[in-house]
Curated annotation (Swiss-Prot):
Species of the source: Rhodopirellula baltica (strain DSM 10527 / NCIMB 13988 / SH1)
Protein purpose: Protein S19 forms a complex with S13 that binds strongly to the 16S ribosomal RNA.
Xref: SUPFAM superfamilies: Ribosomal protein S19
Lineage, broadest ranks: Bacteria, Pseudomonadati, Planctomycetota, Planctomycetia, Pirellulales
Protein name as annotated: Small ribosomal subunit protein uS19
A Pfam family matched in the record: Ribosomal_S19
A GO BP entry: translation
GO MF, any single term: structural constituent of ribosome
InterPro entries per the UniProt record, alphabetical: Ribosomal_uS19, Ribosomal_uS19_bac-type, Ribosomal_uS19_CS, Ribosomal_uS19_SF
Region forming the signal peptide: none
Similarity section: Belongs to the universal ribosomal protein uS19 family.
Cited PANTHER family: RIBOSOMAL PROTEIN S19P FAMILY MEMBER, SMALL RIBOSOMAL SUBUNIT PROTEIN US19M
Keywords: Ribonucleoprotein, Ribosomal protein, RNA-binding, rRNA-binding
Gene Ontology terms: cellular component: cytoplasm; small ribosomal subunit
Length: 89
């Protein structure tokens, strides 16, 4: 079930404040965050985030196509090792 439209998108206030501060100073340094549930808003475009995946931080450069998605969608948490095959028997 999706979030109620009357509530609007969830944006972590700390992340939003850091993006605004970086825009004012013109900083291009990545913003480190653990807020995977934060929705990407248009103010985040062309900002680099370091999103935590449970083990390390993954670098994510936000583009216009990502607006409306969550930051955590672009930092996978599970490593796919592949299905069984001839080499795994």
């Amino acid at each position: 079930m999706s979030r109620s439209s009357k509530k609007g998108p969830f944006v972590d206030p700390k992340v939003f404040f850091k993006v605004q501060k970086a825009a004012e100073t013109g900083s291009k340094e990545p913003i480190k965050t653990w807020a995977r549930s934060c929705t990407i808003v248009p103010e985040f475009v062309n900002v680099t985030f370091m999103v935590h995946n449970g083990r390390q931080h993954i670098k994510v450069l936000v583009t216009e196509d990502m607006v409306g998605h969550k930051l955590g969608e672009f930092a996978p948490t599970r490593t796919f090792k592949g299905h069984g095959g001839k080499g795994k028997r």
